[in-house]
């Protein structure tokens, strides 16, 4: 349900943060 979607977006957000850190 909605909780799973929240977790997916949280994981996506973390991945984006890691990618941004790696690019800099």
Curated annotation (Swiss-Prot):
Keywords, comma-separated and alphabetical: Amphibian defense peptide, Antibiotic, Antimicrobial, Fungicide, Immunity, Innate immunity, Secreted
GO BP term, example: xenobiotic metabolic process
Tissue: Expressed by the skin glands.
Coiled-coil portions: none
Compartments where found: Secreted
A single Gene Ontology CC term: extracellular region
Role played: Possesses antifungal activity against C.albicans and is also active against E.coli and S.aureus.
Stated family: Belongs to the frog skin active peptide (FSAP) family. Pseudin subfamily.
Name of the protein in question: Pseudin-1
